[in-house]
């Protein structure tokens, strides 16, 4: 049996302050929910080992402050991400409207090799609340328009769809990590035209 090197998947969670990013992360990693969370200052992360298609991987899940005054986390925070999770509150339409800005912010800062196909996952959180303002079809339509991003409706408080959502996040992140590894091991070959080949042969001739 061949031993595989340990895989670390970096997952970034973005969204406005108060949408439940920290709650989702804690529900998934620690199976806990609390109403006493303080606003995340800067960035924080939790790790969890999970099985993805018979492969053990470590997910490093990064939580960010949603307030604009903390939005200067910089390139180092985003770089190396394997998946980006965009979270909004289904009871707060403004948090849905800012998904475009968060997605653009990530693509600018992270500069992924293939931005068109970089894996995003969208979570519409707080479905346990009654005063819903963002319809499922509206959220699905936005995701479809952005290269068909996977969409889950979640409740961090009631643990609804949290496990399923993060399974998809882990699987998509692993796929991204594998593609990056393949690209790094087998970069695009340098093509020589006939003149270059002839010149190279002539220079290497010692006669």
From Swiss-Prot:
It is found in: Cytoplasmic vesicle, Phagosome membrane; Late endosome membrane; Lysosome membrane; Melanosome membrane. Belongs to the small GTPase superfamily. Rab family. A motif (Switch 1) lies at residues 28-41. One of its GO terms (cellular component) is mitochondrial membrane. There is a cross-link at residues 191, 194 (Glycyl lysine isopeptide (Lys-Gly) (interchain with G-Cter in ubiquitin)). It is a peripheral membrane protein. Switch I, switch II and the interswitch regions are characteristic of Rab GTPases and mediate the interactions with Rab downstream effectors. The switch regions undergo conformational changes upon nucleotide binding which drive interaction with specific sets of effector proteins, with most effectors only binding to GTP-bound Rab. The modification Phosphoserine is found at residue 72. Gene3D superfamilies: P-loop containing nucleotide triphosphate hydrolases (3.40.50.300). GO terms for molecular function: G protein activity; GTP binding. Pfam families: Ras. Its cofactor is Mg(2+). The gene is RAB7A. The modification N-acetylthreonine is found at residue 2. It comes from Canis lupus familiaris (Dog). The small GTPases Rab are key regulators of intracellular membrane trafficking, from the formation of transport vesicles to their fusion with membranes. Rabs cycle between an inactive GDP-bound form and an active GTP-bound form that is able to recruit to membranes different sets of downstream effectors directly responsible for vesicle formation, movement, tethering and fusion. In its active state, RAB7A binds to a variety of effector proteins playing a key role in the regulation of endo-lysosomal trafficking. PANTHER family: RAB FAMILY, RAS-RELATED PROTEIN RAB-7A. InterPro entries: P-loop_NTPase (IPR027417), Small_GTP-bd (IPR005225), Small_GTPase (IPR001806). Its EC number is 3.6.5.2. This is Ras-related protein Rab-7a. GO terms for biological process: early endosome to late endosome transport; endosome to lysosome transport; endosome to plasma membrane protein transport; epidermal growth factor catabolic process; lipid catabolic process; lipophagy; phagosome acidification; phagosome-lysosome fusion. Mg(2+) binds at residues 22, 40, 63. Deubiquitination at Lys-191 and Lys-194 by USP32.
